[in-house]
Amino acid sequence: FPRYQIGESMVSGMAPLMEELGLVAELDARFQHKSGITLRWGKDPEPWRSDFSAAFSSTGSHFTHAWHVTRSEFDELLLDNARSLGAKVHEAAQVTEVLKDESGRTTGVVYTQGGETHRATARFVVDASGQGRLLTRRLTQTSWQEDLRNVAVWSYFDSYTPLDHKDDILVEAIEGGGWYWYIH
């Protein structure tokens, strides 16, 4: 950490969790606010909008926005926060084996770090490896649903002409199939 990942615009529902983790002030200081989402979808060419503050207030929440984060910074912020809350963090480690109990439940891993082999067990084992799918690859055979084998392409643009709400996420359907997600 940090390591490069494509940026992320968080969904507004993440705000209460970020508050529970004590990260709202840090997120507000470091990352761009997203006030809503504008969509251009279906047969109607006119865009429509969902305002995050209105959505939050309808649930009794005090939040007004979500964030667009730089993933490398956000991931490091989450890792450091977990460490400060007492999580034992192992970096530069390689999982070599998944441990299971007699019933087949995953109970831990064997990993190498600094040339030494270690064993870690826990009541809950969480695979936070993202698209790497470390545990999935070791525990199950991946099967793909053929009609959902999609392709994603990403790029950065130097400039654009925003719609009325420049801090919104923009999602637009593309004629003939597909869509794009634009984050300013």
Enumerate the language-model features and the residues they cover.
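N-terminal FAD cofactor-binding segment of flavoenzymes
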Residues: 3-46
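A generic secondary-structure micro-motif detector
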Residues: 4, 67-68, 112
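Conserved acidic
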Residues: 6, 70, 74, 116
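Generic non-transmembrane alpha-helical segments
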Residues: 23-26, 77, 81, 85
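Short beta-strand segments
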Residues: 46-52, 118-120
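A short, sequence-level motif marking secondary-structure junctions
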Residues: 52-60, 123-125
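Short beta-strand to alpha-helix junction loop
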Residues: 58-81
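Predominantly flavin-linked oxidoreductase catalytic cores and closely associated redox partners
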Residues: 80-184
